[in-house]
């Protein structure tokens, strides 16, 4: 699909290295007729189609493709999916999602353990050390209500009170994300997997944000 559409897909050659992968499989479990559920230890949502669609929105997915009559029927009944076209046995739906949003939810600040403590925790199997993934996983079903955000140096992070975000000229590549916003100074969620090598120009962040994304505070438009 990426080859012919020039559009990325949720699964790819290196996607197992992404911190979004567990959340992808949880979402798929609600959308597929016979989900593979390959990652152990996760609470899957088998056959809970509406919840799966909600997760697509949270993950910033643009399109959903069905290829069985049963799943196509569920997709047609969903108010959050828009049929674009069908070409048997496939039907392509638009997902009502966005790549950049303001964070309006309650914020739960996560304080990262010291590097040496994290290493010792891994070696000794010490489960008392806080882990960002655990906190993000626990709140995956509550993304409309709260976000877990990792900050350092005691920085004060607050939710946005605005509801009229306008994003223009959004451009996402493998090594650069750029956009214009009408809400400088507000906390923006970027639905791209967090990685510590990302750096920001004209703003603060990026901050690791649940479930597995980044957030930034632009200094200007």
Q: Residue spans of the language-model regions?
A:
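Residues at the C-termini of beta-strands that transition into short coil/loop
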Residues: 13-14, 87-88, 96, 210
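Short, charged/polar, Gly/Pro-enriched secondary-structure boundary elements
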Residues: 97-105, 188, 221
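Active-site-proximal, structured, solvent-exposed surfaces of multi-pass membrane proteins
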Residues: 144-221
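Periplasmic/luminal catalytic loop of GT-C fold multi-pass membrane glycosyltransferases
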Residues: 28-88, 186-193
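Extracytoplasmic/lumenal acceptor-recognition loop(s) of multi-pass membrane glycoenzymes
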Residues: 1-58, 99, 105-159, 196
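Short, well-ordered beta-strand micro-motif
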Residues: 92-94, 217
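Structured beta-strand-rich cores of soluble
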Residues: 82-91, 100-101, 107
């Amino acid at each position: 699909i990426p080859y012919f559409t020039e559009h990325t897909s949720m699964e790819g050659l290196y996607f197992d290295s992404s911190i979004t992968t567990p959340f992808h499989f949880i979402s798929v479990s609600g959308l597929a007729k016979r989900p593979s559920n390959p990652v152990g230890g996760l609470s899957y949502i088998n056959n809970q189609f509406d919840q799966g669609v909600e997760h697509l929105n949270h993950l910033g997915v643009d399109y959903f493709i069905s290829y069985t009559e049963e799943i196509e029927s569920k997709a047609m009944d969903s108010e959050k999916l828009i049929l674009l076209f069908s070409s048997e046995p496939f039907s392509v739906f638009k997902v009502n999602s966005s790549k950049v949003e303001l964070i309006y939810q309650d914020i739960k600040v996560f304080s990262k353990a010291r590097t040496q403590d994290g290493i010792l925790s891994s070696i000794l199997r010490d489960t008392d050390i806080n882990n960002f993934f655990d906190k993000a996983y626990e709140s995956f079903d509550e993304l409309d209500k709260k976000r877990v955000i990792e900050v350092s140096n005691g920085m004060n992070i607050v939710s946005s009170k605005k509801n009229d975000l306008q994003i223009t000229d959004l451009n996402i590549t493998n090594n650069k994300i750029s956009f214009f916003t009408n809400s400088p100074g507000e906390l923006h969620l970027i639905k791209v997997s967090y990685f510590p090598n990302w750096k920001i120009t004209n703003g603060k962040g990026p901050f690791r944000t649940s479930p597995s994304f980044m957030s930034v505070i632009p200094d200007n438009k």
